[in-house]
Amino acid sequence: MGDERVAELINKTLHTKPADGSTHWSTRTLAGETGISKSTVARYLQAFQIKPHRVESFKLPTDALFIEKLRDVVGLYLNPPENALVLCVDEKSQCQALERTQPMLPMGLGYVEGVTHDHVRHGTITLFAALSVLNGAVLASCKPRHRHQEFLSFLREIDKAVSQDLDVHCVVDNYASHKHPKVHAWLAQRPRWHMHFVPTYSSWLNQVERFFGIITDKAIRRGSSKSVKELTKKIDSFVSQYNENCKPFVWTAAADSILEKLARLCGRITGTGH
């Protein structure tokens, strides 16, 4: 196939939409539109790494202090202060105690584990967690709600657990309970505590979110619990086992490289990146 037809195919894929109202092209619709075989269309899309069937979501930061906060948090990860413990702290709310209406079907040769679509709700809990950047260990506590009272209670648990000769640097998000006046008052009386807020809409900067993903996938999503007490017990057991073989998440991205990637994304959005 000549270069002109290849260019026509690529241009149509990138800059037009199907006439039938579809949101994106497929190899079948491109083949029908251009008269090129499906296998040839697929081969050229693969060669140019064009994937019209896929989409990725994004959220641009709106925080006026985005760069300052980014450098602050990334600096903690790459160059943690001496005589201090860096903790990534957050809560995972709405952990549901769901009881399946039928026993799970075990996995077997040729078929996966089966769970019923129906379930009985037995309430929710909030999982508070503090992940150590140094060694990956997690301090966790399940609480009935996620108000400032529960957050402050968890900070007290951290304060008792961390040696008094160490400063505590906490990476947190901008949830209202983290900035409550009573939380501020408690922190003001403890000079060893330092709070570092990630930029708005940038929870990906908080390493504890990675742990939340792990525990959700491995211990919560596919489980069945008859009560919040049973769910709490399962979470506590998972955290205990996790800490026996925990390893830190290794942060490698410098602040400048993140900002460069963001600039490229903005260029794509405005059309200057092509």
Go through each PLM region and give its residues:
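Extended, low-complexity cationic-aromatic segments
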Residues: K69-R156, L259-I269
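Active-site proximal helix-loop segment of RNase H-like, two-metal nucleases, encompassing DDE(D)
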Residues: V138, V208-E230, Q241-N243
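Short Lys/Arg-enriched helix C-cap and helix-to-coil transition segments
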Residues: K51-E68
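Acidic, metal-coordinating catalytic cores used for nucleic-acid/nucleotide bond scission
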Residues: H146-R147, C170-P181, T200-L205
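C-terminal domain-tail junction helix/linker
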Residues: R100, E230-H274
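A short, amphipathic alpha-helix used for macromolecular contacts
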Residues: M1-T40, P80-P81
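Residue-level detection of the helix-turn-helix DNA-binding "recognition helix"
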Residues: G35, Q46-I50
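RNase H-like polynucleotidyl transferase catalytic core
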Residues: G114-H119, L187-Q207, G223-S225
